[in-house]
Design a protein with these regions (language model features):
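Non-ligating segments of multi-cofactor redox enzymes
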Residues: 1-267, 276, 286, 291-336
Length: 336
């Protein structure tokens, strides 16, 4: 193992993004606390902001071989807080059905705030960063051994995400407006709905990961949350960018991408990665041997999705440009 893969990377640039996110969440925490006169908002958003900052910082400074552990720290901190404190102890239904129930009832509690800020409004800033850094379902599934999908996406199977989303919405409308059954807040019924729903997610998520050999299969094919996130993430301020003058087209980023995005296709078009499937996990940033991949702020948007589907090779060496001897050595090492 090379020294670089064992070395900590204590460079100033790795402290910038964690600091920005910490400031954003602390601002939200203090603002809502003062507006609502409720200390819950101060604790809630401060904890989430600190957890995100810790995970992002660790992801940046840890040795390359274990950078993924930084993201796991945030996933477990935020995920356990949401599940244990809000879901189990607070008896709030943090599933999407709970959000629909509370929204139609006009109730502004933890679950409502979580969806409106993290999964809808926040996507205009950090895209689907929730999925990459805070989802409690994938916090467990990411411990499975299939981090790098090999076969590509199954065409049209992602349509089930929309079936799930509108099915959940229809179920809530039916229960509330046809059966006239309004859930009681912080009840055992809400807790049961939350626990049973999560159990189903974990079982189905594990089965999909096992049979498709892809930890993120449930994200791609069944989870309804991306339906909420897609509009905002298309126009998010923070996105992945690949600097063409530094890229040697080794395709390490595409080989490691857990969401099967053809990252270099965006580079060839002179654009940042506009795919709504990007979860801002930063894997591509930290596997790049030439530091060509970066997480940048800007204003753009687009609707073209460049994704790798079943049967396509992990990477095509198209448009390879002449590279220096030192860059060739890097590519040869990666391709062994």
């Amino acid at each position: 193992m090379s020294k670089s893969k064992n070395s900590w990377d204590i460079r100033g640039k790795h402290f910038i993004l964690p600091a920005i996110f910490l400031v954003i969440f602390m601002t939200i925490a203090i603002t809502l606390w003062l507006m609502k006169d409720n200390v819950f908002y101060l604790f809630n958003f401060s904890f989430i902001g600190i957890s995100l900052a810790i995970g992002m910082l660790l992801t940046g400074i840890l040795p390359k071989k274990i950078k993924y552990r930084g993201r796991l720290v945030t996933q477990f901190l935020v995920g356990s807080y949401m599940v244990i404190f809000l879901g189990i102890l607070g008896r709030e239904n943090m599933q999407i059905e709970g959000f629909f129930f509370y929204l139609f009832m006009g109730v502004f509690i933890g679950a409502t705030i979580h969806y409106l800020i993290a999964k809808i409004g926040g996507t205009f800033i950090f895209g689907r960063g929730w999925c990459g850094y805070a989802c409690w379902t994938v916090a467990i599934l990411d411990l499975l051994p299939w981090k790098k999908p090999r076969e590509g996406r199954i065409p049209y199977l992602s349509a089930f995400r929309y079936v799930h989303f509108f099915g959940s919405l229809g179920l809530v409308i039916y229960v509330m407006y046809v059966l006239k059954d309004r859930p009681e807040l912080e009840s055992l019924r809400e807790l049961s709905w939350f626990l049973i729903g999560n159990l189903i997610y974990y079982v189905v998520g594990f089965l999909l990961a096992y049979f498709l050999k892809d930890n993120r299969a449930i994200c791609k094919y069944l989870c309804p949350i991306p339906v909420l996130q897609k509009v905002g993430s298309r126009f998010s301020i923070l996105k992945i960018n690949i600097k063409q003058d530094k890229c040697v087209e080794c395709f390490a980023c595409e080989r490691e991408c857990p969401m099967d995005i053809k990252l270099l296709d965006y580079m060839y078009k002179g654009k940042r990665v506009l795919s709504t499937e990007c979860i801002s996990c930063m894997t591509c940033v930290y596997v790049c041997p030439t530091d060509a991949v970066e997480y940048t702020a800007g204003f753009d948007g687009g609707f073209k999705e460049y994704l790798r589907y079943y049967g396509e090779p992990v990477a095509l060496k198209k448009n390879r440009k002449p590279i220096s001897n030192s860059q060739k050595k890097i590519v040869e090492t990666l391709e062994k």
